[in-house]
Amino acid sequence: MAQSKLYPVVMAGGSGSRLWPLSRVLYPKQFLCLKGDLTMLQTTICRLNGVECESPVVICNEQHRFIVAEQLRQLNKLTENIILEPAGRNTAPAIALAALAAKRHSPENDPLMLVLAADHVIADEDAFRAAVRNAMPYAEAGKLVTFGIVPDLPETGYGYIRRGEVSAGEQDTVAFEVAQFVEKPNLETAQAYVASGEYYWNSGMFLFRAGRYLEELKKYRPDILDACEKAMSAVDPDLDFIRVDEDAFLACPEESVDYAVMERTADAVVVPMDAGWSDVGSWSSLWEISAHTAEGNVCHGDVINHKTENSYVYAESGLVTTVGVKDLVVVQTKDAVLIADRNAVQDVKKVVEQIKADGRHEHRVHREVYRPWGKYDSIDAGDRYQVKRITVKPGEGLSVQMHHHRAEHWVVVAGTAKVTIDGDIKLLGENESIYIPLGATHCLENPGKIPLDLIEVRSGSYLEEDDVVRFADRYGRV
């Protein structure tokens, strides 16, 4: 029997607040470069190098779709393989969508699915790949494999898996029947778990056949499967995205894969993984897994420390200096600064809740915002004016649009701009400018080979992004 195809499924939903101000609702941590030059999503995908598998399937929120597409494109992994969730419904429905898509792509057999989170750090990638290979025979045989992280300390922030009897498998493979899933314990209980040697951290990574998962979901949560089947029956292909039926998916109950299937099935096994795993759940955990200076500091960007110890200092856009401090987290972005005791960073989410309650925007969006055509940076704003730096990628362009409440001035800084205003087309080079009157139908394109940079000055009574009427758009946003 030929080996089943293996589809990596990367869960890239979620918009956590624990790494604010870097992580925002519209740009959460899985899309950030926290270690090295690749984002967490890209690192997750590159970790599969050396594992024989198909192109990854990525599941994400619709509002993150262009970020995911661009990051996959940079890896040459963009192959109409992004499933869009109209709204988050937790992991059981998301995995069901991926399983139905995998079965549709490989109807000749029951493909394997390697379910991964986009925002985990794994230091020993060889150990990760070895654990995946170890788990393959069990998944091929119909088991539902969960990967248990060998704990190195009594962590109270993770759930645990208690192993049972050894599960019969091929020579040189090791797996155990799952005896119990347990919630996050207190410290005393966690210490007992680690001392026993019978418990693993629950990693949230899985390997099983798509059909076997759907069978178990039908057995234990047929309502979830029914909603997901209806959502996938009316798929709308859109560029590199798979859009499911919104109404059908919104009717789907929310449930985690652990509660829906893994805690109920009789075929769950746990494969140990000792690979330097972390879910990077806080600034303190990021400090722990990063390279330190002799003083115990972790620095990113333009940083000068003096008599500073055991601190995490991140400078995004300017010089950050520290003097005579220790055990701090200092994070500077273009529009917000966090200063926290490293042992109290679990309360960062409370600050984010306050920002949201105050009606501010810093919890939701960065000053620099990415779009399918490029990005813009909100440089300055005041009464009836706003200044942005706009970058348009070669060959890309903004929608044909108009605004009810603002006029715009554009000044080209670098590259070439093709500007259409009420049907009149003009080409602008460096240091040339143009005025777009209020109510004019207009479009901006980059016909050149290098990025187009321009300064936009908006003026008017209302300057927010929702003052736009789109008439045509190459990215399907009309």
Curated annotation (Swiss-Prot):
The protein's annotated pathway: Nucleotide-sugar biosynthesis; GDP-alpha-D-mannose biosynthesis; GDP-alpha-D-mannose from alpha-D-mannose 1-phosphate (GTP route): step 1/1
pH dependence per the UniProt record: Optimum pH is 8.5.
InterPro entries assigned to the protein according to its UniProt record, in alphabetical order: GMPP_N (IPR049577), Man1P_GuaTrfase/Man6P_Isoase (IPR006375), Man6P_isomerase-2_C (IPR001538), ManC/GMP-like_b-helix (IPR054566), Mannose-6P_isomerase_type2 (IPR051161), NTP_transferase_dom (IPR005835), Nucleotide-diphossugar_trans (IPR029044), RmlC-like_jellyroll (IPR014710)
GO MF terms held by the record: GTP binding; mannose-1-phosphate guanylyltransferase (GTP) activity
Pfam families, A to Z: ManC_GMP_beta-helix, MannoseP_isomer, NTP_transferase
Keywords: GTP-binding, Nucleotide-binding, Nucleotidyltransferase, Transferase
Enzyme class: transferase
Catalytic activity: alpha-D-mannose 1-phosphate + GTP + H(+) = GDP-alpha-D-mannose + diphosphate
Signal sequence region: none
Family: Belongs to the mannose-6-phosphate isomerase type 2 family.
Stated role: Involved in GDP-mannose biosynthesis which serves as the activated sugar nucleotide precursor for mannose residues in cell surface polysaccharides. In vitro, shows very broad substrate specificities for four nucleotides and various hexose-1-phosphates, yielding ADP-mannose, CDP-mannose, UDP-mannose, GDP-mannose, GDP-glucose and GDP-2-deoxy-glucose.
Protein name per the record: Mannose-1-phosphate guanylyltransferase 1
